[in-house]
From Swiss-Prot:
Organism: Streptococcus agalactiae serotype III (strain NEM316)
Gene3D superfamilies membership: Divalent-metal-dependent TIM barrel enzymes (3.20.20.150)
Catalytic reactions on record: D-mannonate = 2-dehydro-3-deoxy-D-gluconate + H2O
Keywords assigned: Iron, Lyase, Manganese
MF terms in GO: ferrous iron binding; manganese ion binding; mannonate dehydratase activity
Recorded superkingdom: Bacteria
Classification lineage: Bacteria, Bacillati, Bacillota, Bacilli, Lactobacillales
Gene (UniProt): uxuA
UniProt name for this protein: Mannonate dehydratase
């Protein structure tokens, strides 16, 4: 198991030097953030990124992510050219020795929260999702804004894309995902790249949009789309646990049994009323996930891939990208490493 850390490039207030000082830290999870979605990442740009990371004494463990263009998700005629570009990016990453790619198939919006700075009694702040608040939000008219909404969409463009998805139900989205997988995975497999689809976050429909990578049944359906280790998942326990109907340990065990876990996101959340939840500190006592059992499963199944502490609280007066500060994620990384050491030594 390789401890890794998300880094958002030169614009990230958390530096590679900061990250390299975290005990047990080996890898960086990053991407090229200024190439428009759908265009090819050149080998030159990948080399530049790799050299920068390695100069700090680290390595690129995972690319998170190579975004999937909306036209692919919608099944538009332009998808074939866009998939060709995606395949070329996968090949270019493989040529530079990068073998794991995280991606998602969420329509329009990435991870969704209703507050980026919910304040706990101790003064720390965290990301939360309030189901009641989310139902009042209108992505088209913008009466309420949502953290993570893509500012690159004008109101007219947002309306157009939301209207387009009105014609896409869950089965149609599965059909479009299947088309993508059947084109991508053979090419990824041929160059030794493991793809790792991230679950929908949260793992249920919002704003009437279909969401399909949501739980155990979805994972079992997904892995059958193409029988290859290259067609794997990102086991994001915090995302799966955000649906109170999901048993995240059952999901984790089954995913490992299927040998499709290519990347692990380890963060904790505290379930609230209905489908509301708050992100918490990583230790089990603060959330609804038994992190010790998650790490035990990683060891039991011999997981050797990258794991990273996911979103953290903002603590000790830190400011920066919500969920992606240094301090709480560093605490999370050392906590996870401590659990891993305890599991290994306790199993002897």
């Amino acid at each position: 198991m390789e401890m890794s850390f998300r880094w958002y490039g030169e614009d990230d207030p958390v530096t590679l030097e900061n990250i390299g000082q975290i005990p047990t830290m080996k890898g960086i999870v990053t991407a090229i953030y200024d190439v428009p979605v759908g265009e090819v990442w050149s080998r030159e740009r990948i080399q530049q990124l790799k050299e920068k990371v390695e100069a700090a004494g680290l390595k690129i463990s995972v690319i998170e992510s190579v975004p999937v263009h909306e036209d692919i998700k919608l099944g538009r005629p332009t998808r074939d050219l866009l998939i060709d570009n995606y395949i070329q990016t996968v090949k270019n990453l493989a040529a530079e020795g990068i073998d794991t790619i995280c991606y998602n198939f969420m329509p329009v919006f990435d991870w969704t929260r209703t507050d980026l700075a919910y304040q706990y009694p101790d003064g720390s702040t965290a990301l939360i999702f309030d189901e009641t608040v989310s139902k009042k939000m209108d992505p088209v008219n913008g009466e309420l804004s949502l953290p993570g909404w893509d500012a690159s969409y004008s109101k007219e463009e947002m309306k157009a894309i939301m209207d387009a998805y009105a014609e896409i139900d869950e089965e149609k989205l599965w059909e479009n995902l299947t088309y993508f997988i059947k084109r991508i995975i053979p090419e990824a497999e041929a160059v030794g790249v493991k793809m790792a689809i991230h679950p929908d976050d949260p793992p249920y429909s919002i704003f009437g949009l279909p969401r399909i990578i949501t739980g155990l049944e979805a994972i079992e359906r997904f892995v059958k789309l193409y029988d290859s280790k290259s067609n794997g998942i990102t086991l994001c326990v915090g995302s799966y646990a955000s649906d109170p109907q999901n048993d995240v340990l059952e999901i984790s065990r089954r995913a490992f049994e299927l040998d499709r876990v290519n990347f692990v996101h380890a963060r904790n959340i505290k379930l609230g009323d209905g489908k509301s939840f708050k992100e918490s500190a990583h230790p089990s006592e603060y959330g609804s996930i038994d992190m010790y059992e998650v790490i035990k499963l990683c060891h039991e199944f011999g997981f050797e891939g990258a794991i990273r502490p996911d979103h953290g609280r903002m603590i000790w007066g830190e400011t920066g990208r919500p969920g992606y500060g240094l301090y709480d994620r560093a605490l999370g990384a050392t906590y996870l490493s401590g659990l891993y050491e305890a599991v290994i030594k306790g199993s002897k």
